[in-house]
Amino acid sequence: MTKKKAHKPGSATIALNKRARHEYFIEEEFEAGLALQGWEVKSLRAGKANISDSYVLLRDGEAYLFGANFTPMAVASTHVVCDPTRTRKLLLNQRELDSLYGRVNREGYTVVALSLYWKNAWCKVKIGVAKGKKQHDKRSDLKEREWQLDKARIMKNAGR
């Protein structure tokens, strides 16, 4: 029996979309693969990705990541045209695609990218079916977060 490889030090997360959790209620999450070009993989290994403005388009029975920015490396090949904001195809199975189509078309949800990470040697994107928050929802979340920080600070100082 072979030994399992030791986990590499460092985080597997490439990019997070913190704004999505602030602006949307995330109802359901899916893991999807990405169809990438060689220079994009090289950029991701260097951690040069931004998904803060990205969302998922559902068209012709397929899902596409739109608005993600992968900054090309300076040492990437010169004979390939590098488009940092190109639309990338998401690799999902048919059941997941049908679920996304149903939620988006019927119930008025949207699909946003939540995080970009490595799973073994493959780059994966976590997408979420989301519904927009109102302004008062955002304010109540902010108050709750501040209260949690204050509570932790009080408990820390109470032990002294």
From Swiss-Prot:
UniProt protein name: SsrA-binding protein
UniProt lineage: Bacteria, Pseudomonadati, Pseudomonadota, Gammaproteobacteria, Enterobacterales
Family per record: Belongs to the SmpB family.
InterPro entries the UniProt entry points to: SmpB (IPR023620), SsrA-bd_prot (IPR000037), SsrA-bd_prot_CS (IPR020081)
Locations listed in the record: Cytoplasm
Organism of provenance: Citrobacter koseri (strain ATCC BAA-895 / CDC 4225-83 / SGSC4696)
GO molecular function: RNA binding
Its biological purpose: Required for rescue of stalled ribosomes mediated by trans-translation. Binds to transfer-messenger RNA (tmRNA), required for stable association of tmRNA with ribosomes. tmRNA and SmpB together mimic tRNA shape, replacing the anticodon stem-loop with SmpB. tmRNA is encoded by the ssrA gene; the 2 termini fold to resemble tRNA(Ala) and it encodes a 'tag peptide', a short internal open reading frame. During trans-translation Ala-aminoacylated tmRNA acts like a tRNA, entering the A-site of stalled ribosomes, displacing the stalled mRNA.
Alphabetized UniProt keyword annotations: Cytoplasm, RNA-binding
Domain of life of the source: Bacteria
Signal sequence bounds: none
A biological process term (GO) from this entry: trans-translation
NCBIfam families: PRK05422.1 (NF003843), smpB (TIGR00086)
Pfam families: SmpB
GO cellular component labels: cytosol
